[in-house]
Amino acid sequence: MFAVIKTGGKQYRVAANDVITIEKLDGAAGDKIEFTEILMVGAGADATIGAPFVEGAVVSAEVVDHGRAKKVIAFKKRRRQNSKRTRGHRQHHTIVRILDIAAAGGKAKKASKKAEAAAEEAAN
């Protein structure tokens, strides 16, 4: 079973026991957290798509560690001015392990009109 979660302005496709790096979250290493903004949940062809989120779906995870990304250098130079500026930035991130995906109460994905027409023809 997999889910697509939204956190930190980004979307991640996760499954049980996945370890992912996301934007910084509060909480110490070992704390349990829950993601409730689930965009999609399912297994194979049997997937439920939210509008915008799947109702009642929850992904639980455990904080593994906090860290900082590699340094990104922002360098500005003004030619012929003997002027330059160097800045560095390291973004904070959190490493989490996905424990469980619960899809209870999700809305069913509405079938397309072509699929409905094919089902009617098969029934006749």
UniProtKB/Swiss-Prot annotation:
Under the heading Pfam families, the entry gives: Ribosomal_L21p
Q: Write down any Gene Ontology CC term.
A: ribonucleoprotein complex
Gene Ontology molecular-function annotations: rRNA binding; structural constituent of ribosome
SUPFAM superfamilies linked: L21p-like
Per the record, the domain of life is Bacteria
Q: What does this protein do?
A: This protein binds to 23S rRNA in the presence of protein L20.
> Which InterPro entries does this chain map to?
bL21-like, bL21-like_sf, Ribosomal_bL21
This protein's name: Large ribosomal subunit protein bL21
Q: By its UniProt entry, which HAMAP family does this protein fall under?
A: Ribosomal_bL21
GO biological process terms, semicolon-separated: translation
Question: Assembly state and interactors?
Answer: Part of the 50S ribosomal subunit. Contacts protein L20.
Similarity field: Belongs to the bacterial ribosomal protein bL21 family.
* Keywords for the protein's UniProt record, in alphabetical order: Ribonucleoprotein, Ribosomal protein, RNA-binding, rRNA-binding
